[in-house]
Amino acid sequence: MASENPFRSILKALEKPDGGEFGNYYSLPALNDPRIDKLPYSIRILLESAIRNCDEFQVKSKDVEKILDWENTSPKQVEIPFKPARVLLQDFTGVPAVVDLACMRDAMNNLGGDSNKINPLVPVDLVIDHSVQVDVARSENAVQANMELEFQRNKERFAFLKWGSNAFHNMLVVPPGSGIVHQVNLEYLARVVFNTNGLLYPDSVVGTDSHTTMIDGLGVAGWGVGGIEAEATMLGQPMSMVLPGVVGFKLTGKLRDGMTATDLVLTVTQMLRKHGVVGKFVEFHGEGMRELSLADRATIANMSPEYGATMGFFPVDHVTLQYLRLTGRSDDTVSMIEAYLRANKMFVDYSEPESKTVYSSCLELNLEDVEPCVSGPKRPHDRVPLKEMKADWHSCLDNRVGFKGFAVPKEAQSKAVEFNFNGTTAQLRHGDVVIAAITSCTNTSNPSVMLGAALVAKKACDLGLEVKPWIKTSLAPGSGVVTKYLAKSGLQKYLNQLGFSIVGYGCTTCIGNSGDIHEAVASAIVDNDLVASAVLSGNRNFEGRVHPLTRANYLASPPLVVAYALAGTVDIDFETQPIGTGKDGKQIFFRDIWPSNKEVAEVVQSSVLPDMFKATYEAITKGNSMWNQLSVASGTLYEWDPKSTYIHEPPYFKGMTMSPPGPHGVKDAYCLLNFGDSITTDHISPAGSIHKDSPAAKYLMERGVDRRDFNSYGSRRGNDEIMARGTFANIRIVNKHLKGEVGPKTVHIPTGEKLSVFDAAMKYRNEGRDTIILAGAEYGSGSSRDWAAKGPMLLGVKAVISKSFERIHRSNLVGMGIIPLCFKAGEDAETLGLTGQELYTIELPNNVSEIKPGQDVTVVTNNGKSFTCTLRFDTEVELAYFDHGGILQYVIRNLIKQ
């Protein structure tokens, strides 16, 4: 059990410059350990957290030593516990998290406890940004029209989240129409340094969205996790992570005139993809850092998932402090942040000699080498220099189908297709732009590129250029601040004139919420098999993500989005070909509309003001009239509607008592599914559309839901009945029980019946039979999806026996009370002669004190086979979760006892 922190002796007072104290803090220098000076700054944040939270139970002294000895331990894949300071959610992932909290309150109440104790123990911020679609564009009424449609579609989900914002303490819900979660986090939510009841410590955050990494640009350690990990963090539990290697990325020089942060981030993404940084931190340093604005850094940090790193970290320096003042943080707060970080060796001063920091590996980029570029047509790291774009496009048309190929026959590459657009004859060719979107927190958080785009629009309008009316243009700012500085600059009217009117404040086109393109354009593309293009200032461009009909999708800076919209095609050499013809008949080139760095800097200086941030965020939680008119119950216990197909009370705590059930072995269990290698979380719990013949579809139709209103599994994550039916429902899943047949079915072994996985699981349950899963290597790889653990638990799966597990999925299985077992090295189901038709018994002691992390466990089958597996409960804390039947049950019982 927990004991007093053994590091209390290094708790020091932090003095204010003018007398008095800011508070107390755990002083890293007071350890008197020379290894600290060599640690990357990102690792120092992990070290401080381990020291502050050390209780010899959840976090142990040996964990602190592992981090201190990072230079030697990081190559060895050692695991450490980490307790982030706060949690960040968006609405798609936030709904199931709030469902779980509401259900826990009911369980507390039923057990005679105080249900109001179920509150997040760390601050939780939930920003509703994933639901708005670009139904209406090129209209100054677009914001209101799109918001009304958003509320019509999502009224039930929004009402539930609004109830949660009132019912739970320590939970802030930012209503729809306010901005994009990561930009709001950067401009407002991030603390950088916490002061909680007089204890100072670094801000850190985990979020249920991969681009949580954007906050690393502000010197706040943050990355994306799965839902169960996020819920566990909310409730005070540590998350388990491998102590990462750190790639040092040195920046030198400065960007040349006309280069943008987007050009830089696409260059960095390509370099890091080539280097290989999966599972690692990347830490930026060097004298070139002085030349990067905070917004530039945030752009680079945002795309960490695209270059594969856990984080792209920028330590706090003077630029960070300037940004904090600009965005309305008080002078006292900024003074405290600087004093704390300097005192604890977490502040970088580039006017001083570079520190002795050691990195796992190193890269270097001279900023002067960055050139204008885009990325595409199908992957974020496929960078194309602008000067090579036309040639690259033609090679893509030629190449066989792949990441850089469309296999368009030579004779068809130059064909022009005529179509009727609002009574006018128009033409489309391969490469023509049909969507041009200034979108995504990656770029809309950066005033330089946003105002740069507005300057391009002004120059284009002054010269008489126009955007073709069938191109779907849109501007979706990540916060209301963008609207204010565009208005202050007087440049928004030029964007409007070109069709880039504001369509909403949310993720929109970047996550595929691009809405329909004009019917005539869509027909021309489909009927003639055209490779149409989208150009967007987003962070992902995988085929089919932006829009089903744009097979070529290019990531570009906001100014380049405007330029390509004006050109109307990606099949252009901006250096030699005109972008269009001006009002005097003169040819206009790219260089005629491109602003200089000086022009951009001047308009940023005069238009982006601290008062804008204060005015925007003072009212951030108030919401609009539609949000305020949503009527919700005032109680702290949720009133579940049994008819709802979006929000449903899950059965996790049914029959729960105050006594932990204790460890349970598995007796005579059938193998529900028998898998090979690389079963991903998308195989286990798909997020996409609900197939018309699936158990989930049947459930919805029985409740009167029309097929066109099925929506996706992702949107229905608040309903366990649908998600359980969607477990193992991937149409591409391969189950050895089916002997070569592909699809979401299995065999009910006693009868030989071929059934859907859900129906087979329910049949076993009705017969009183446990089930297990057999699998190969890398079970649970891919997205850290919590329903990939919740779903199997609801199907009655008691254990998974595999060659290896993906790290996050293993911890999610533990959190849901499922036993993870690994075959011994060199063994698997095949080498052991297991067919999956056997009955399996897993022998475990009845007392958790007799079980040790990582111990050997014997598995016996009914045909006399016996083999040994490694029990993948890796820590004593995980054994405690198992003893209680899962992490949420563990938390409930502990809160009642307190």
From Swiss-Prot:
<dbReference type="InterPro" id="IPR006249">
    <property type="entry name" value="Aconitase/IRP2"/>
</dbReference>
<keyword id="KW-0816">Tricarboxylic acid cycle</keyword>
<dbReference type="GO" id="GO:0048027">
    <property type="term" value="F:mRNA 5'-UTR binding"/>
</dbReference>
<feature type="binding site">
    <location>
        <position position="90"/>
    </location>
    <ligand>
        <name>substrate</name>
    </ligand>
</feature>
<dbReference type="GO" id="GO:0009506">
    <property type="term" value="C:plasmodesma"/>
</dbReference>
<dbReference type="InterPro" id="IPR001030">
    <property type="entry name" value="Acoase/IPM_deHydtase_lsu_aba"/>
</dbReference>
<comment type="subunit">
    <text>Monomer.</text>
</comment>
<comment type="function">
    <text>Catalyzes the isomerization of citrate to isocitrate via cis-aconitate. Contributes to oxidative stress tolerance. May have a role in respiration.</text>
</comment>
<keyword id="KW-0479">Metal-binding</keyword>
<dbReference type="InterPro" id="IPR044137">
    <property type="entry name" value="AcnA_IRP_Swivel"/>
</dbReference>
<keyword id="KW-0004">4Fe-4S</keyword>
<dbReference type="InterPro" id="IPR018136">
    <property type="entry name" value="Aconitase_4Fe-4S_BS"/>
</dbReference>
<feature type="binding site">
    <location>
        <begin position="784"/>
        <end position="785"/>
    </location>
    <ligand>
        <name>substrate</name>
    </ligand>
</feature>
<feature type="binding site">
    <location>
        <position position="545"/>
    </location>
    <ligand>
        <name>substrate</name>
    </ligand>
</feature>
<feature type="binding site">
    <location>
        <position position="507"/>
    </location>
    <ligand>
        <name>[4Fe-4S] cluster</name>
    </ligand>
</feature>
<comment type="pathway">
    <text>Carbohydrate metabolism; tricarboxylic acid cycle; isocitrate from oxaloacetate: step 2/2.</text>
</comment>
<comment type="similarity">
    <text>Belongs to the aconitase/IPM isomerase family.</text>
</comment>
<dbReference type="InterPro" id="IPR015928">
    <property type="entry name" value="Aconitase/3IPM_dehydase_swvl"/>
</dbReference>
<keyword id="KW-0963">Cytoplasm</keyword>
<dbReference type="GO" id="GO:0006102">
    <property type="term" value="P:isocitrate metabolic process"/>
</dbReference>
<dbReference type="GO" id="GO:0003994">
    <property type="term" value="F:aconitate hydratase activity"/>
</dbReference>
<dbReference type="GO" id="GO:1990641">
    <property type="term" value="P:response to iron ion starvation"/>
</dbReference>
<dbReference type="Pfam" id="PF00694">
    <property type="entry name" value="Aconitase_C"/>
</dbReference>
<protein>
    <recommendedName>
        <fullName>Aconitate hydratase 1</fullName>
        <ecNumber>4.2.1.3</ecNumber>
    </recommendedName>
</protein>
<keyword id="KW-0007">Acetylation</keyword>
<feature type="binding site">
    <location>
        <position position="540"/>
    </location>
    <ligand>
        <name>substrate</name>
    </ligand>
</feature>
<dbReference type="GO" id="GO:0051539">
    <property type="term" value="F:4 iron, 4 sulfur cluster binding"/>
</dbReference>
<feature type="binding site">
    <location>
        <position position="441"/>
    </location>
    <ligand>
        <name>[4Fe-4S] cluster</name>
    </ligand>
</feature>
<dbReference type="GO" id="GO:0005739">
    <property type="term" value="C:mitochondrion"/>
</dbReference>
<dbReference type="GO" id="GO:0006099">
    <property type="term" value="P:tricarboxylic acid cycle"/>
</dbReference>
<keyword id="KW-0456">Lyase</keyword>
<dbReference type="GO" id="GO:0005829">
    <property type="term" value="C:cytosol"/>
</dbReference>
<dbReference type="Pfam" id="PF00330">
    <property type="entry name" value="Aconitase"/>
</dbReference>
<keyword id="KW-0408">Iron</keyword>
<feature type="binding site">
    <location>
        <position position="510"/>
    </location>
    <ligand>
        <name>[4Fe-4S] cluster</name>
    </ligand>
</feature>
<dbReference type="InterPro" id="IPR036008">
    <property type="entry name" value="Aconitase_4Fe-4S_dom"/>
</dbReference>
<dbReference type="InterPro" id="IPR000573">
    <property type="entry name" value="AconitaseA/IPMdHydase_ssu_swvl"/>
</dbReference>
<dbReference type="GO" id="GO:0006101">
    <property type="term" value="P:citrate metabolic process"/>
</dbReference>
<feature type="binding site">
    <location>
        <begin position="209"/>
        <end position="211"/>
    </location>
    <ligand>
        <name>substrate</name>
    </ligand>
</feature>
<feature type="modified residue" description="N-acetylalanine">
    <location>
        <position position="2"/>
    </location>
</feature>
<keyword id="KW-0411">Iron-sulfur</keyword>
<dbReference type="InterPro" id="IPR015931">
    <property type="entry name" value="Acnase/IPM_dHydase_lsu_aba_1/3"/>
</dbReference>
